[in-house]
Curated annotation (Swiss-Prot):
Has low cytotoxic activity. GO terms for biological process: killing of cells of another organism. Keywords: Cytolysis, Disulfide bond, Hemolysis, Membrane, Secreted, Signal, Target cell membrane, Target membrane, Toxin. Disulfide bonds join C24-C43, C36-C61, C65-C76, C77-C82. Its main location: secreted. It comes from the Eukaryota. This is Cardiotoxin 7''. It comes from Naja atra (Chinese cobra). Residues 1-21 form the signal peptide. Belongs to the three-finger toxin family. Short-chain subfamily. Orphan group XV sub-subfamily. It is found in: Secreted; Target cell membrane. GO terms for molecular function: toxin activity. InterPro entries: Cytotoxin_Cobra, Snake_3FTx, Snake_toxin-like_sf, Snake_toxin_con_site, Toxin_cobra-type. Expressed by the venom gland.
Length: 83
């Protein structure tokens, strides 16, 4: 019984992500992403303001949401692959 309990504990530890890491898209392609470094807790997506289609021109990880510029609108989120 103790062996079974120990096995379950080990399997649980191995399967759990002990240190949560955020995953963000980092290219214009939606199926490519990277794990963000420690301290970067937001994903962002930049789109062109004047372009009718909201195609992302830049994606990545950030510690703070970048400010909008004259050309780019930034949207930030904090869940895996949300950008």
């Amino acid at each position: 019984m103790k062996t079974l309990l120990l096995t379950l504990v080990v399997v649980t530890i191995v399967c759990l992500d002990l240190g949560y890491t955020l995953k963000c898209h980092n290219t214009q392609l939606p199926f490519i992403y990277k794990t963000c470094p420690e301290g970067k807790n937001l994903c962002f997506k930049a789109t062109l303001k004047k372009f009718p289609l909201k195609f992302p021109v830049k994606r990545g990880c950030a510690d703070n949401c970048p400010k909008n510029s004259a050309l780019l609108k930034y949207v930030c989120c904090s869940t895996d692959k949300c950008n």
